[in-house]
């Protein structure tokens, strides 16, 4: 997944260990969805919301704020699904308000289902 933040400074070489702590400063990364939305003509724009609380509320807010056609809401607070797992359980929400919840399945199956649901609309 693309991160919202990136390291402000980076080195092309190994950073040697010193006796001091190392502090990283992060800055906002570019908004890829905004860039794609600004170029959009007839494409269907799908975003992803990885959330640890208020899953549907936060996902719907992002759907509206970013003017997406669909958003795939992913609850990352569960250890058996999400980032640290090979399986996932998501809810696909359309801009018209339709919701399709997918049961826990492999991430490959989730991707296929997302594609099939959007293709079928």
Regions found by a protein language model. Give the residues of each.
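Glycine-rich phosphate/dinucleotide-binding loop and adjoining beta-alpha-beta core of small-molecule
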Residues: 1-79
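Small-residue (G/A/S/T)-rich helix-start motifs and N-terminal tracts that mark the onset
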Residues: 68, 75, 80-121
């Amino acid at each position: 997944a693309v991160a919202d933040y990136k390291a402000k400074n980076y080195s092309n070489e190994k950073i040697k260990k010193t006796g001091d702590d190392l502090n990283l400063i992060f800055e906002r990364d570019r908004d890829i969805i905004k860039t794609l939305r600004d170029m959009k003509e007839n494409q269907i724009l799908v975003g992803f919301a990885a959330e640890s609380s208020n899953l549907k509320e936060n996902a719907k807010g992002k759907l509206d704020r970013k003017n997406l056609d669909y958003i795939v809401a992913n609850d990352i607070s569960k250890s058996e699904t999400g980032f640290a797992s090979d399986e996932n359980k998501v809810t696909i929400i359309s801009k018209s308000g339709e919701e399709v919840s997918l049961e826990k399945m492999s991430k490959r199956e989730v991707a296929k289902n997302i594609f099939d649901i959007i293709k079928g609309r």
